[in-house]
């Protein structure tokens, strides 16, 4: 019994140390992984209550960092690469959460709007986005960066698309291929 308890304590200590190492090094991990990510991969910046998903392709990292800072860093890193471009999704619920139920939500919405001012984020119900990640995670890699934010429906989901080939170019190609 004592040996089992000691072993359990050691496992818990090692797990905590690993989590601490992961949270302090999420930026390096993002920089290393970004060149490997491509079209159909996702990056999600999520609040602290976001669930740990179990699809094999989903990797979750606890950043222990400010939510808006993580969003800024991800967009900064994405701006430095040419091979992918972000398609941004936010929770539909974000627009409806009242300040009286979630203190700080108004300031968050305003700050997020400034960060996303040059983009066109799409809005979908939270459960639909989780389902999209779950499905994509069966085949493609999903990087989930969990932050210390405790305001609901504040996650930002980024589906990566090809940075050097547009949807219009793909459509023209498919049309040309259909013609004899």
List the model feature ranges, each with a label:
Residues 1-8:
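Bacterial N-terminal signal peptides that target proteins for export
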Residues 12-20:
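Hydrophobic h-region of N-terminal signal peptides that target proteins for export
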Residues 20-68:
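Long, hydrophobic N-terminal alpha-helical segment
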Residues 36-38, 80-83, 136-139:
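Flexible, charged surface loops at secondary-structure boundaries
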Residues 41-44, 59, 85-89, 121, ...:
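Structural motif
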Residues 51-52, 60-82, 86, 106-126:
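Feature captures the catalytic cores and cofactor-binding loops of soluble hydro-lyases/lyases
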Residues 83-106:
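Ordered, amphipathic secondary-structure segments that act as subunit-interaction surfaces
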Residues 101-180:
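Glycine-rich, aromatic-bearing surface loops/beta-hairpins
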């Amino acid at each position: 019994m004592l040996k089992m308890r000691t072993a359990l304590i050691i496992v818990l200590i090692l797990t905590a140390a690993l989590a601490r190492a992961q949270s302090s090094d999420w930026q390096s991990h993002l920089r290393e992984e970004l060149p490997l990510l491509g079209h159909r991969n996702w990056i999600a910046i999520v609040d602290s209550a976001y669930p740990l998903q179990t699809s094999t392709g989903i990797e979750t990292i606890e950043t222990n960092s400010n939510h808006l800072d993580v969003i800024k860093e991800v967009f900064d890193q994405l701006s430095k690469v040419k091979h992918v471009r972000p398609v941004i999704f936010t929770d539909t619920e974000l627009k409806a959460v009242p300040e009286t139920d979630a203190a700080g939500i108004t300031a968050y919405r305003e700050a997020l709007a400034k960060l996303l001012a040059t983009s066109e984020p799409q809005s979908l119900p939270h459960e639909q986005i989780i389902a999209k990640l779950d499905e994509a995670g069966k085949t493609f890699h999903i990087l989930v960066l969990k932050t210390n934010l405790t305001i609901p429906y504040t996650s930002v989901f980024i589906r990566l698309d090809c940075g050097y080939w547009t949807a219009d170019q793909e459509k023209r190609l498919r049309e040309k291929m259909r013609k004899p």
